[in-house]
Amino acid sequence: RSLVEERGRFLMIPSEEISAMAPEGPVHVNATNIKEVIFPLEGETAHAVLEANLRAVHEQAKRTGREILPHLNHPNFKYTFTAEILAAVTADKFFEVYNGHMSVNHLGDADHPSMERMWDIANTIRVADLHAPPLYGIATDDSHNYHGNPRAAPGRGWVMVRCRHLTPEKLI
């Protein structure tokens, strides 16, 4: 961290991909600005697993007094999630509308909507039927390799934030 972080110019924020399993498939939740590791929680459905892990993130935030940003990673990975589940889990405010990894199916297929279409469906349900706030989309590159395989390299998806102060408290 001391090699790259520069006050006011470059900031590293502690984060974790909480990786759990549900009967429908994998459930991955990112938690940004954590203080300590959050161990994955299981459940009987993808909906229940997502809610349990979001609850664990919110509990750490409350206990530590630290703002933590959770988001659902790559809902179309193994087609674990539907737009209806995304809409119903109103504790989640963010999800990956784009993930640059080659295996996450962000374009969907003949039987599953693309992430962009899923986002439209989920927000229509949230706003019109549940009277809940919309779900915001973010992008990540999901880097797994930093040298070699360009299909899992950095730089294919990111989030830019305009912020007066480069601190976790102001960004999150």
Identify the residue ranges that each predicted region occupies.
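Extended, charged catalytic domains and RNA/DNA-binding interfaces, predominantly
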Residues: R1-I172
